[in-house]
Amino acid sequence: MWNMLIVAMCLALLGCLQAQELQGHVSIILLGATGDLAKKYLWQGLFQLYLDEAGRGHSFSFHGAALTAPKQGQELMAKALESLSCPKDMAPSHCAEHKDQFLQLSQYRQLKTAEDYQALNKDIEAQLQHAGLREAGRIFYFSVPPFAYEDIARNINSSCRPGPGAWLRVVLEKPFGHDHFSAQQLATELGTFFQEEEMYRVDHYLGKQAVAQILPFRDQNRKALDGLWNRHHVERVEIIMKETVDAEGRTSFYEEYGVIRDVLQNHLTEVLTLVAMELPHNVSSAEAVLRHKLQVFQALRGLQRGSAVVGQYQSYSEQVRRELQKPDSFHSLTPTFAAVLVHIDNLRWEGVPFILMSGKALDERVGYARILFKNQACCVQSEKHWAAAQSQCLPRQLVFHIGHGDLGSPAVLVSRNLFRPSLPSSWKEMEGPPGLRLFGSPLSDYYAYSPVRERDAHSVLLSHIFHGRKNFFITTENLLASWNFWTPLLESLAHKAPRLYPGGAENGRLLDFEFSSGRLFFSQQQPEQLVPGPGPAPMPSDFQVLRAKYRESPLVSAWSEELISKLANDIEATAVRAVRRFGQFHLALSGGSSPVALFQQLATAHYGFPWAHTHLWLVDERCVPLSDPESNFQGLQAHLLQHVRIPYYNIHPMPVHLQQRLCAEEDQGAQIYAREISALVANSSFDLVLLGMGADGHTASLFPQSPTGLDGEQLVVLTTSPSQPHRRMSLSLPLINRAKKVAVLVMGRMKREITTLVSRVGHEPKKWPISGVLPHSGQLVWYMDYDAFLG
């Protein structure tokens, strides 16, 4: 086999010399050469690379590697190579000749131990010496699970690096971690063996021809798009990948990752950055593209649990039980469908909804990025007189059609009433079947273009790897920015039960969703059960708002949405009474995730709220800059303040950032806030204070055994949290208890245990700070959803 490879390399060298000056030899090592990805895409991609490059000055050798013993591995690899095919326009005789050459240049070898890698390196060097070839570089393609990366990387680094003057390129396939922490860990491990410029992380969506065309299209059509590509003209952006197949046969992978990690965090996020980034002057510059992508990540508004809806096809749990030998009682919470609402808080995109959606067992297989423009025209003539190329009353949209669907191919679609686009010569105008409608319009209403020659994504990316084009791959910085954005949402959804759907056409309208004020929700209500059991599930309306007592104070309990609505109504009623009586309303609000839905409800459904006469105060604040995503004020700004007309001088953030320092005792930030309260709030008695309750019984930022804030004369104190950021500023318990009304909002199954515990304890604020909340002359009301109250 070794002698045959030498002969084949010499023949290839002769062909290169006849073609043009020899540029060196490239060894390509495919790890996982007998796996599914290699069989379906990678060997064909390598063959296409050979067809494209063999006559242009380089010689090649291909090493298929796996853990399998040599004889069996060679048989498996030979079987995978049987399906290689040539482009349709290549003559059969030429195809057979090139295929034969490729097979001769390809050999299998077992790579299992450090000695195996050392032997590979010696063989490559010996082959180069015998053939008299100069080494240009080596490509190691990791088509293996991530847990194998570290050992392989160590062996390559220690014994398989090419000599001086030759390059090394290491290709990595997703998944690149499970969350931000694991991605950081994996990146650190790989960084000990390889330089950043040596690593090529593959997201095969970046090899899709329609996706790869987004930046060039924007660049070629700058003049037409400059005035349109912004919040004033774009109504929304949809980035979609739908599949008809389910996860059968892949549930071990899917149980660990789910649809958000599998598709949204990588493929759809990459498309989002290409659509939303500021256009670099040079769209071919990897450094410029990365810099502009990172600017998008920095502007992304943080995701909350309400930013997403999730579903799961009905047979998924049964498939998991069967394939992973789970007990009959096992029910998976892994989503197979997800839609997420993303907002970008910058001048170009502020207020424009970006919808990312993907799912399995849906009604069609299709992928696209659709930019829908606002229709701001009013046409006088009747609809029958509207012309597609002229009427501004017809839909105006730009679609990067990634593939499949009714169109069946990659395409770029531009509404004729938008502009006539410019595309490179590698794209041609296309004609679809008569009567075909796409996105609400007949195909004839679009300028439609498709690639002159369709290419598989992996073939495209292998060519980019060979030529060292880094702008088509995921850098470490890009990867970690993406995980930093998605990890909080994944954590918030970890215990959320997905909506079940039958799959395919039977889904009907079950997965249809709507969005409003930063929240996404299903259009149709689904029955929920208070306690799982046989028989029909009761509807939320079957359970009225429950009124009872909790710790001798009034309790309001309901399903979460109804509870939030009730609390918002109560706050508005309290505000109206206070303004009518005193001319103003002083409201102190807590941060965290629980009040987000309340803020959104107040911002979108309470048009009679007396915001002009309302003063907003903070119950507590983390010692971070107010612009920090961890800041309670930043959450209040994102979900409430920017949506209501409240005078800026009525907004009172806590002064945690003074003298360019955070919560320094000598800056007296707590005393400053206390004096402000005393000056503006009569008797330092807030009209309403909204609190939450932590799993440890803390409230505000008053934690168990806190040395300050639980008693004494101080109105505002600095405290220390057991979780980061540790330093906090908080209203004290004595100040809270001066309020006319205190509302405690408790939501979620995670609070069930502490809710039960606190119901049984007495007045023990040192141990359970929440137990010390009891207004001296005001009212305390508990608001608990059924998950927290009943479990």
From Swiss-Prot:
Homodimer. The active site is at H267 (proton acceptor). Residues 527-540 are annotated as: Linker. It comes from Homo sapiens. Bifunctional enzyme localized in the lumen of the endoplasmic reticulum that catalyzes the first two steps of the oxidative branch of the pentose phosphate pathway/shunt, an alternative to glycolysis and a major source of reducing power and metabolic intermediates for biosynthetic processes. Has a hexose-6-phosphate dehydrogenase activity, with broad substrate specificity compared to glucose-6-phosphate 1-dehydrogenase/G6PD, and catalyzes the first step of the pentose phosphate pathway. Changing P146L: In CORTRD1; no effect on protein abundance; decreased glucose-6-phosphate dehydrogenase activity. The modification N6-succinyllysine is found at K208. Present in most tissues examined, strongest in liver. One of its GO terms (cellular component) is endoplasmic reticulum. Its EC number is 1.1.1.47, 1.1.1.363, 3.1.1.31. It is found in: Endoplasmic reticulum lumen. NADP(+) 2 binds at R370, W617. In the N-terminal section; belongs to the glucose-6-phosphate dehydrogenase family. In the C-terminal section; belongs to the glucosamine/galactosamine-6-phosphate isomerase family. 6-phosphogluconolactonase subfamily. Residues 20-526 are annotated as: Hexose-6-phosphate dehydrogenase. Keywords: Carbohydrate metabolism, Disease variant, Endoplasmic reticulum, Glucose metabolism, Glycoprotein, Hydrolase, Multifunctional enzyme, NAD, NADP, Oxidoreductase, Pyrrolidone carboxylic acid, Signal. Pathway: Carbohydrate degradation; pentose phosphate pathway; D-ribulose 5-phosphate from D-glucose 6-phosphate (oxidative stage): step 1/3; Carbohydrate degradation; pentose phosphate pathway; D-ribulose 5-phosphate from D-glucose 6-phosphate (oxidative stage): step 2/3; Carbohydrate degradation; pentose phosphate pathway; D-ribulose 5-phosphate from D-glucose 6-phosphate (oxidative stage). This is GDH/6PGL endoplasmic bifunctional protein. D-glucose 6-phosphate binds at K174, H204, Y205, L206, G207, K208, E243, D262, K360, R365. Residues 541-791 are annotated as: 6-phosphogluconolactonase. The modification Pyrrolidone carboxylic acid is found at Q20. Residues 1-19 form the signal peptide. One of its GO terms (biological process) is response to nutrient levels. It is linked to Cortisone reductase deficiency 1: An autosomal recessive error of cortisone metabolism characterized by a failure to regenerate cortisol from cortisone, resulting in increased cortisol clearance, activation of the hypothalamic-pituitary axis and ACTH-mediated adrenal androgen excess. Clinical features include hyperandrogenism resulting in hirsutism, oligo-amenorrhea, and infertility in females and premature pseudopuberty in males.
